[in-house]
Amino acid sequence: PRIEDVAIAKGKIIDRGQDLNYTNAEKVIDAKGLWLMPGLFDIHTHYDLELEVAPALPESVRHGTTSVVIANCSLGLAFGSQRDGINDPIVSCYARVENIPKSVLKNCADNVDWENPKDYLNHLDTLKLGPNVVVLLPHSMLRIEVMGFDDSVTRDPTDIELEKMCNILQHSLGIGYVGLSTDALPFHYLAAHPHCEKTIPTQFAKYRELKKLTKVLRDKNAVWQATPPKDSVIDTLKTFLLTSARVHGKALKTTVVSALD
């Protein structure tokens, strides 16, 4: 750390040093005893639901965070509640993964009034957000949207369904989403019958599906957020192989939770 003056004009630092001349400055802030630092960028959060009740995210901002990434680990609200009359995906997917009471999740789902990725971004624009919010497209919800909840955890997608997933991802990247989030942690289970013994939909995706989706990301210079299948060395290696520039001709921007307890 250094003790010095900082001159700012039009939102940019134009000078810094000891005892700057501030005679013509419009405003002088005495920051003696305080720290001046860049805003923190929190790249892995699960604030999707919290934004709906406390969009200012004061507990995050007060620590110096100015930007957050949401919809990590394949879970998010990009497609709305996705209720089908029987299944309640927000409740089932979030309850055990995020340890949130089902009653709270149900109330959140009741208040969702959008049904697609574009309308979700428009919804976020109506909130009085504290930090900047960056959104990933959640893979579990993408599978549910294309295949239906029950099928998303019982079978592979057809060629047509996989192509539709790729098209939705490509469109979403074009309107402001920065990437795709997936998950492979073995303790992320669903919370509603008859699927309580099954993990969230993203974990049913085979290598072929992930390869197709990550190709879209690579072509668009977008980001793949992932957690590796920690119980399988082979599957973990295959996961990281998808990021290889040598194999695929171009590097893939990736953020991976690689250190696990």
Language model: regions and residue ranges:
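Short coil/turn connectors at secondary-structure junctions
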Residues: 23-26, 32, 36-38, 63-66, ...
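Structured core elements
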Residues: 7, 42, 69, 132-136, ...
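Histidine-rich, glycine-flanked metal-binding segment
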Residues: 1-39
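Divalent-metal coordination cores built from histidine and acidic residues
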Residues: 53-179, 217
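Short low-complexity, flexible loop/linker segments enriched in glycine and/or proline
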Residues: 29, 82-93, 194-199, 240-242
